[in-house]
Structures are given as structure tokens and as C-alpha cells.
Curated annotation (Swiss-Prot):
It comes from Methanococcus maripaludis (strain C6 / ATCC BAA-1332). NCBIfam families: PRK04180.1, pyridoxal 5'-phosphate synthase lyase subunit PdxS. InterPro entries: Aldolase_TIM (IPR013785), PdxS/SNZ (IPR001852), PdxS/SNZ_N (IPR033755), RibuloseP-bd_barrel (IPR011060). Pfam families: SOR_SNZ. The active site is at residue 81. D-glyceraldehyde 3-phosphate binds at residue 165. GO terms for molecular function: pyridoxal 5'-phosphate synthase (glutamine hydrolysing) activity. The gene is pdxS. This is Pyridoxal 5'-phosphate synthase subunit PdxS.
Amino acid sequence: MKKLGTDLLKRGFAKMVKHGVVMDVTNVEQAQIAEDAGAAAVMALERVPADIRVQGGVARMSDPEMILEIKDAVSIPVMAKARIGHFVEAQLLESIGVDMVDESEVLTPADEVNHIDKRAFTAPFVCGARNLGEALRRIDEGAAMIRTKGEAGTGNVVEAVKHMRAVNEGIARVVGYKEMGLEAELIQMARNELKVPMELISEVAELKRLPVVNFAAGGIATPADAALMMQMGCDGVFVGSGIFKSGNPATRAKAIVEATYNFDKPAVIGEVSKNLGEAMVGINIDEIPEEKLLAKRGI
């Protein structure tokens, strides 16, 4: 019962930022711009994904002092990234009071086989997923929020779209099997394909969605990108490099918040999309060498 209560509390926090925008920030000034723009939360990190991609090297957890400075400067929740499998980085982030830990493929993985046992923490976690199997495996480990992986730092939404479609298609299969009474197929799917407990599959079949909130991330650069992902069924969006690598960060941040909230109102999205200045320079996915793709990290 204690574990269930903890899961409910963690998922409850994640629901608090539903329909909102989480913005990557690297300093206090950016965090304040994000808060003023209406961000639901900020992600504190030393380098945005676009810079990590260009500069290379090993990307690690950010300096705790920088994270604390941002926490002191804003009243909205502050998240921070830990490397995949690096449970000590997660322990440090929990100890300084971050509101949510992102076990992130943007950073260099510390463990190529295992993810963090998120049930061992009181802090909630968000994790990336490319398909239903990855999403449910992270939830089984204790994740309170899922996001598409997309391809961070590219300003190109195509991979986020691909990942959201894959999750939606997986859910549709589960629901279809359940409605047709194909219990044997569901059991086989859980055991051999998705590699998760049947209880999670049953929960997906009943809810007809993931049992936790599911945000878009990776390549969101414009208000239209944000609205696209929301119309595909996302519960909110993460924006990494797309704001502070653009020509007018404050205006673009506000516009993306408005578009996320009014995702089904094209006239509003069109209005807020005017005069935003230059968007970040994007990268075509097929121009990225296979070994440089971030979304492959963690399975």
C-alpha cells in the first residue's frame, strides 16, 4: 500500500503540469523568462541539447549549485536531468529538492543495459519512449511521466511525431485485442513483445491510454509543432533548444505556451505565430550519423 501511495503522489505531481510547457533553461535569466511566459515548469541544465550535440563529449548531470540558483529564482517546479542508469546522480538531484528527475537520453548513458529503479525514490521521474514497449517498461520501473524521445537538439519534430504515433498504435492494438476478447494474444504481447507485467497491459486496455501523463519532447520549435503534438494526444510539451536558440526567446516562449493551451484553435495558433523572429536552425534527421542519434539510447 505504501508503494501504491507513493506512485499516486508521484503521478499526481506529473498531472499538475498537464496541458503545460516545460522549458529547458541554463541560467536564472532564462528561468525567469520561462516563468513570465507561462511555463508550467523549467528543466535546469548547463547545456541545451543543441549545444550538447555540437560540442560532443560526455554530457553529465548539471552542477547542483546552478540548479539551486534556478530553484531560488522561480516559483514554478524545477526539473533536472540524470544520466540513464546513474542512480547516484538521481540521488543527488533528489537530495537538493528538484521537483522531478528526467532520466534522459540527452545525457551520456551511465548504464547501457539498466535504467534507474525509480521506485526507490520519493522524487517523481520522467523518461523518454519511442513506442509502447519502452513507455510501459519505464512505467513498470516507476516513471510518473512519459515523453516522446524525438531527436533532441534538432528543431525537427519528425521523430517526436513518429514516436507518438508508435505509442498510439500500440495502445490501439491493446484495446483492440481486449475488445475482441483475445486474452491469449494480450498475454503473449505482454510477455514476449512489450516485456511488462500483464497488469500494466490491462490498465492500458481499460484507460485506452497510458496510465501516466505523456508529453511531447524532441524537436519542438514552433507554436504549430506544439499544437501538432497536442492534437496527436500528448498531454503537454517539453521545449529544449527551440526557445533560447531562436531569435526572440521571450515572445516565442509565450507563443508556444498559448499554442499548447489552445492546440485545437487554428486562429489562435496563427495569431501567436506572427512576428516571432527566426526559429532555431534545424537539422534534418537523415543528416545525422547513426552513432549520433540520441533517441536510440535506453530501451
